[in-house]
């Protein structure tokens, strides 16, 4: 049995979970998220209000999807109650970020500013010209937008310039030694 999959998912007060076949819809104080569970996995609501994720057999695919499905359900419940935030920082002379309406505009050493539009359900907060955060209720969407922003100017291994996650350690390389 999957060690993660067999743990029941607790549903906090104020969160409404609707299960219809393989579809799970979660409504909470921050919004609504929906998820479709893969076919061999079943999800049931227990009497105490928690959710249990079960698999019909011990086939390799069922075992692989068991823990994944339980974690995805737990993530959407956390998303509609607390939400997710990724804090990011920019290092480099002249590199900065500004909020234009709901969107971000980066100056990253290119000849032009780089705009990033806020997709539905994502909010940007700029704390300073070199620090900002990406927030939302969908963990996958927050992580993907953060990764796309980081990809604009990856941290340089020689000088450390670029966009990085807060607290991320960049592996530095030693430059060429002159004669």
Swiss-Prot record:
Part of the 50S ribosomal subunit. This protein binds to the 23S rRNA, and is important in its secondary structure. It is located near the subunit interface in the base of the L7/L12 stalk, and near the tRNA binding site of the peptidyltransferase center. Belongs to the universal ribosomal protein uL6 family. One of its GO terms (cellular component) is cytosolic large ribosomal subunit. It comes from the Bacteria. It holds the Pfam family Ribosomal_L6. The keyword Chaperone does not apply. This is Large ribosomal subunit protein uL6. Keywords: Ribonucleoprotein, Ribosomal protein, RNA-binding, rRNA-binding. GO terms for biological process: cytoplasmic translation. InterPro entries: Ribosomal_uL6-like, Ribosomal_uL6-like_a/b-dom_sf, Ribosomal_uL6_a/b-dom, Ribosomal_uL6_bac-type, Ribosomal_uL6_CS. One of its GO terms (molecular function) is structural constituent of ribosome.
């Amino acid at each position: 049995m999957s060690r993660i999959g067999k743990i029941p998912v607790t549903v906090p007060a104020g969160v409404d979970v609707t299960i219809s076949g393989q579809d799970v819809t979660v409504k909470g104080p921050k919004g609504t998220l929906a998820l479709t569970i893969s076919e061999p996995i079943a999800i049931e609501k227990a009497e105490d209000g928690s959710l249990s994720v079960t698999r019909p057999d011990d086939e390799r695919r069922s075992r692989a999807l068991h823990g994944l499905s339980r974690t995805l359900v737990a993530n959407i419940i956390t998303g509609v109650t607390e939400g997710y935030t990724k804090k990011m920082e920019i290092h480099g002379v002249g590199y900065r970020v500004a909020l234009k309406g709901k969107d971000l505009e980066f100056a990253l050493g290119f000849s032009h500013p780089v705009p990033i539009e806020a997709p539905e359900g994502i909010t940007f907060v700029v704390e300073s010209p070199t620090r900002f955060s990406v927030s939302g209720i969908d963990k996958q969407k927050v992580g993907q937008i953060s990764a796309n922003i980081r990809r604009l100017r990856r941290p340089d291994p020689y000088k450390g310039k670029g966009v990085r996650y807060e607290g991320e350690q960049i592996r530095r390389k030693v430059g060429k030694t002159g004669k």
